[in-house]
Amino acid sequence: MSKELIQQVTAPNGSVFTGSGTNSYLIGREDITLVDPGPKIDEHIEKLIKLGEGKIKRIFVTHTHRDHSPSAKVIGEILNVPLMGRLVEKDDTLQDKTFKPERILGHGDLIETAEYTIESIHTPGHASNHLCFLIREEKAMLTGDHIMNGSTVVIAHPDGSMKDYLNSLALLRKYSFNKIWPGHGAFLEDPMAVVDWIIDHRLEREKKVISELNNFSSVTSEELVKSVYDDVDSKLHPIAVWSLEAHLYKPVSYTHL
């Protein structure tokens, strides 16, 4: 039996930020594209190289947060294969400084092999350099941290943008796919329902931000998060503050909604 065209391999880095761990993907059987090789953990690096069976030809990253791209440099040097992705527009402490792409992937770029075609889709929001990858033959979208299973994603200002994030979610409606392979968690079906739910959830949260702001003459983000995210475990409020501030920094207008 031939192996699946898309293999998901989860890194052993589970945490409150990463859920069960960061998902790496091996695309293809004979001409493999490795997507999001993950954190620099020897066990995970060795597993990916072993599963690749000497057939990994290139490495893509969805974005350069430190749970997604640090292994790219290591594996790229071991296998002598090129790194492809984008660099951030506004640097912050979340970024992997070791990622230096040989090729900058633009919106709509295609990588074509005898087995599959990958389309690069620029989806800023979670990070300014975030990309999703459509595997056309499988009608599958690799979403990195644009969409996760089990949690909504953190939008951390200044590199993260709530306005860009919502526009990028709406952009996915233009593509034909029936399965989401996320950066964290298991695959998701009925993708348009997932996209619509996330957009609605974020807009409802924004309404709550505006409503709660009216109750204060002066308030800090740390105080405001308690009422805006009162449905979220208080242990997660320090993380939720990032998304709260992204709502506060966001202009009102959206392009695609």
For the regions a protein language model found, what residue spans apply to each?
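Short, positively charged loop/turn segments that connect secondary-structure elements
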Residues: 230-242
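Conserved small/polar residues in nucleotide/adenosyl-binding loops
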Residues: 255-256
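Active-site HxH/HxHxD metal-binding segment of metal-dependent hydrolases
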Residues: 15-20, 39-117, 139
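Short, hydrophobic-biased segments on the C-terminal half of alpha helices
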Residues: 245-249
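Metallo-beta-lactamase
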Residues: 34, 39-40, 117-208, 212
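Short acidic, hydrophobic short linear motifs in intrinsically disordered regions
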Residues: 218-230
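Conserved beta-strand hairpin/beta-sheet module of binuclear metal-dependent hydrolase folds
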Residues: 2-51, 132-144, 149
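Short helix-to-turn junction characteristic of helix-turn-helix DNA-binding domains
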Residues: 213-217
